[in-house]
């Protein structure tokens, strides 16, 4: 089978390509230029070229920087301006990697596209679903909630049945040169963030703009450094007069540049809504497991569709829901879709 492999210049994607080559597949390597850091691209393209030369496969470099900027990067900035906590990876995957890159791979005559994601594909009644990775500590299915069944059917995740701790030894044994590759340390798993998301925002908007902190009764009780520097649940970086116990951000008013803070129990919610839904065609209202942020523990909840929105009711109090994050719905370890929390 002819398969396109997205190569990032790192160990995981390189070993994914090696695994598929060992299985006898015909491969085409693809490197995506998404963010605007040419210094990073130069290094990672060089790394990807080394992997392709070792495997004896061609490498194509696709420049999607303009598309990425308008569809992902600019949306990231806008979301923070609106007081939300965006999830750019969940937006990038369906539009870039499994959108534009997949389309290109199909034009090359490839039947499928592979990546180093920690996830799996499972066919149920001739329909393809995303399944959680074997390694639950590294599972990335959360970021794949917006993919259509027809797209999922064209995906391959060679690392999905492996444990992260085993991959580097396997990769170095198979491809010794991987141990000599230079890389940049990524922050928060967001490819275009150098040190922190705040540094990225500072390039485009006024981040350090002092404002007031209010309690749930609307009383001014302190100050903060600028609302974009905070997310729901944060407990540091702002002042609260006479506070004897920790206070947490429970709300953000972007228009007024105000934070609303409260105690930990004030972070609790029993329901939430999500828009821009992407759910399986056969989805039925009922009890499922949900995640409202990456790396959170799956939580039981009743999920229903109403007026094109996803509505969730929790059995137990759920803490720290942030607008802009992905709400993802699972049945056991099978991904059924999700939406953006509002």
From Swiss-Prot:
It catalyses: S-sulfanyl-L-cysteinyl-[protein] + uridine(34) in tRNA + AH2 + ATP = 2-thiouridine(34) in tRNA + L-cysteinyl-[protein] + A + AMP + diphosphate + H(+). Its main location: cytoplasm. The keyword Ribosomal protein does not apply. Pfam families: tRNA_Me_trans, tRNA_Me_trans_C, tRNA_Me_trans_M. Its EC number is 2.8.1.13. Residues 138-140, 293-294 are annotated as: Interaction with tRNA. CDD domains: MnmA_TRMU-like. The active site is at residues 92, 191. Disulfide bonds join 92-191. It is found in: Cytoplasm. The keyword Nucleotide-binding applies. Keywords: ATP-binding, Cytoplasm, Disulfide bond, Nucleotide-binding, RNA-binding, Transferase, tRNA processing, tRNA-binding. One of its GO terms (cellular component) is cytoplasm. GO terms for molecular function: ATP binding; tRNA binding; tRNA-uridine 2-sulfurtransferase activity. GO terms for biological process: tRNA wobble position uridine thiolation. The record marks 117, 325 as: Interaction with tRNA. NCBIfam families: PRK00143.1, trmU. Catalyzes the 2-thiolation of uridine at the wobble position (U34) of tRNA, leading to the formation of s(2)U34. Belongs to the MnmA/TRMU family. This is tRNA-specific 2-thiouridylase MnmA. It comes from Helicobacter pylori (strain Shi470). The gene is mnmA.
